[in-house]
């Protein structure tokens, strides 16, 4: 009789233990939030984009970061501004063959057709390549037509990242149209370009899906540190266009004595030092080139590290010298 009661008591204790057992801990928020979950969660999570994984990826590919949309994006890409025709197609194919897995284009560049062709002809599965494009302000009044045009010209099934190219009238209207395409699965992530502290702070409360990335002019002569830190604090990635100076200013930057000295000490080019400096600040880069040697050079930046002293010397080069009109 006593034995029977003991067995019953043990069974009850066992049931209670099972019902209150803790679930094994989850390593990170990205383990449980999928891209589909994040579509309607503009706060998703506050990512730390101030530090990147800086070791070369598999087969020479650039490492990736997890965007707040739940998708992964390479931290080095090919910029295609000024690339046209077969030169653009071949540059995209060359970049992909050398390990690039991110390609940046825009309606304003006039080369979405060529970029799409380069991606399709690369021989690399579509899902391994991250393609970003941008709507221009003159498209914001009829954004649905503009988005459909981008999809048609690229002809790659879906767009990994679509950005607003500049602030402007109807930019919120255009972004809200982009949000609809995210929910429909035709665009995966959204971003903005040329948005600084006031612009991004005014913009965020007006939209549903949080931008994953802000693309701004950034180079050693215009480091924009306050803006970079502010955007990082919002859990948004930062990307540099004009990382090497741009529009008539590249030669001066690439011959800067401080940068030349640092480059020589590492056996690297000045361009490689600048790109590495960006990455060590947590800034994504999209250098452009049609020269296969330069394209290869621009992704060969994962086998050296700038010292704290070198990073400080480059920081001292800041002139607040902005080279673009916006």
For each of these PLM feature ranges, what is it?
Residues 21-129, 244-246:
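N-terminal binding-site loop/beta-alpha segment at the start of enzyme catalytic domains
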Residues 54, 166-326:
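Beta/alpha (TIM)-barrel catalytic core signal, keyed to glycine-rich beta->alpha loops juxtaposed to Asp/Glu
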Residues 144-164, 180-184:
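CE4/NodB-like, metal-dependent polysaccharide N-deacetylase domain
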Residues 83-96, 139-155, 198-201:
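Short, acidic/polar
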Residues 6-14:
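Bacterial N-terminal signal peptides
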Residues 126-139, 160-167:
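A short, structured active-site edge motif that brings together acidic residues
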Residues 83-86, 104-114, 136-142, 167-171, ...:
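Acidic-and-aromatic substrate-binding clefts and catalytic sites of carbohydrate-active enzymes
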